[in-house]
Each structure stands twice: as structure tokens, then as C-alpha cells.
Amino acid sequence: MSATEPMIVAEGVSRVFGTREREALAMLAAGEDRAAILARTGTLVALNAVDLRVDEGELLVVMGLSGSGKSTLLRCLNRLVEPSRGTVRVAGREGTRMGARELREFRRRTFGMVFQHFALFPHRTVLENVEFGLEVQGIARAARRRAAEEALGLVGLAGWEDKRLSQLSGGMKQRAGLARALAADAAVLLMDEAFSALDPLIRRDMQGELVALQRRLRKTIVFVSHDLEEAIALGGRIALMKDGAVVQDGTAEGIVAAPATPYVERFVEHVDPAAVLRVGTLVDRGTSAARAGDARPGTPVVGPDGRLLGRAAAGGAVVACAGLDAGATLREALPVLAAEPDGVPVVDGAGRYLGVLRRTAALNALARRVPPPAEASPWTSPSPASPSTTSATPPSTGSPRMEPVLPAS
């Protein structure tokens, strides 16, 4: 794998289930829709020409309703489900061309999987479950035990090594499943609705723990979910699927601000925009800063390096003030903005002045009247990769445009 190649590259991946596969694929190539193909051939189109790229160390959430194809896509990545058409490359190797023995070895060393229903062995202890993947690989007992114990420590189960599964709660069992995947030190983690069976509070805890682990370990993770709130909490890129195709791919902020289709609009209509939209998207860049000594009172003042120093006061004085970080969410910014009628200066990660966040912009955002964010902006893309999947459905011409409705103040 070259330094610039994504960890996962899926190109034109289709999967159909039924006895008339060739006919169904021909109809698919001719532009027939899923329902027509099913009615004519009795063959179900599970995936329709999916293109997907996931960079090394990126967390991608694949979302959609039941039957949208998200779990089938996940299993096509490691060929647990055989693609009917298309190619999949992982770590520079094309799995769709591997023989059975090579594929088994590739799966063992490249992929870890975490399932919704744990898939643990009830007759084994926690430690024996976690070391199972290494045992299958033929790793020596002492080495695999060390790796399993380290993985259990990472997920907060140190001290539970010799317990039976019957002694664990649901959340602890899912931690054990995650530890099993981590112990194998796989480059790619495939997580299929891994937290869906957990109670809400435990689920949120597991989401936070996964985010913390990802920051530390920088694994490449493909996480399947049907819950947009979960996708937002995980903070990665989102690929949203419908009828076997990816209909929108981008950050949570980009999808909430500019849904590509009515289907996507329905997905995001109940999401709190204050929890998703970031200050850098809403900043008024037309408010210029000045140098100390020649600024009107209240004007942001910057130094020679463009860093915010404060606000100008009477007599040429500068009153220190902290700028809002462009990466902060609107929810984090609202308490500060409420105390500043003239708006709050916004700075980048290095403290350089970018502009001012105004109350009108915040109100427009809460009313979902914001311009679509630039997906490449550093404050809108927590994952290193930019969106790379083309929309399978064109933007709806009937969708409301995200334009400001209040005059700038």
C-alpha cells in the first residue's frame, strides 16, 4: 500500500441475492431500479455500484435504515459476503482476487470484527475469549495472553480475565468483544451495530470509550449504525445509504446543513443543529480586525502575526478577550454569545483571528438557515479524509435552500 492510498477502496461494488443474478446485474447496469428488478427476477439488489474510500486511521460510519445494504457492504469489505460485481482493496491488496487460503489468512491479520450480539464463547473465560483470534493464528500462549491482557486494560476490564461471561453485564460483554478485536492488532475494525443492543446510558459510555480509543490507537474503523445521534457522537465521516446505494457522504455538519435528498432530510430533521454545527461555519468574515492604537472601540485587535489580542477600548487601550475556537459547536458557543451583544471574535487553532460570530447567525443556524459548510474546512472535518463517495441520488430540487433569513447585525 502506497503512502497516499486509502486503507480501504471499494469501486463499483454491487451485490444481488437470487437465482437470476446475471439478469439482475444487466438490468441494474441499464438503470432499472431495485423494485423493478425484484418484481421481474425475484432477485434482491442489496448493493448498487457503491464507491467508497476510507483513509488509514479514519472512522467511517455507514448509516441507513434496515435493508439499506449497510451490513452487506461491511461484509463485502472482508468477503464474508462475495461482491457480485466490483472490486475491494484493503491495505493495497485486492481481496476479490484472493484464493480461499490466502483470504483466510488476510482476514485473520487485517480485520477485527465486533458484532451487535457479542459472539463470545460461553464456555470460555473473558481472557480466553479475548485471545481467541490470536489462538487461531497460532500465536504462542504467553504472547497471546499478554496481548489479551493489554486489550482488556484498554477497554476497562482489567481484573476480569478469569470471569465467566455469565458474570458480565451487556456492556462488559461488548467491551470483551471489542478487546478481542483489539488484541489481534488488526489494521481495520469492522463494527456492525456494535452498541445497538445496549441500554442507552451504557451505549453512550461505549461510544465515548470508542472515540477515546480511536484517538489513542488510530485504527481504521468502519462502524455500521442506523442512529444518526450515534454517528454524530462518534465524530467521523458518515456515508448514508438507501436501497443499496450511498446517497450522501460527508461530515455530520455538512449533512445536517445541506441534506442531498428528501430521504436525508428526514434522517436529520430531529437532530439538534446546535450540537452539530461549528462556529467556523457561521463566522462573519467581513468584520475586519485592526491593529492596536488605530481601532474604534469594540473592534477586534490583532497582533502582527494575526493573533487575536482583544477588543479596542477608549484611548487606544486593548481589553483582553478570549476568542471562540472555530472548531467549537454552536451549543458550546451559545453561553458566551448570550453575554456579547456585539458578537464574539472567532479564532483558529493557532489563535489567529477569523471573524465574528453574531447572534443573528446563531439564530439562523438554530432555524436550520445556514449556508452549507465547506467540507474541507479544518473545523468541519474531524477525520483526516475528505468525502470521496459520489451521491447515488441527485440533490432534491424541492429541498429548501439553506440561506440566511435574518439581516446581519
Please name every model-derived segment:
Residues 183-187:
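A short, proline-enriched helix->beta-strand linker immediately N-terminal to the Walker B motif
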Residues 164-168, 172:
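Conserved ABC ATPase signature
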Residues 243-245:
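Conserved ABC ATPase "signature" C-loop
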Residues 78:
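Helix-to-loop junction immediately C-terminal to a conserved catalytic motif
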Residues 249-250, 258, 356:
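ABC ATPase "signature
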Residues 13, 27-36, 93-94, 131, ...:
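Conserved ABC ATPase "signature" region
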Residues 284-306, 312, 319-350, 355-375, ...:
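The conserved cystathionine-beta-synthase
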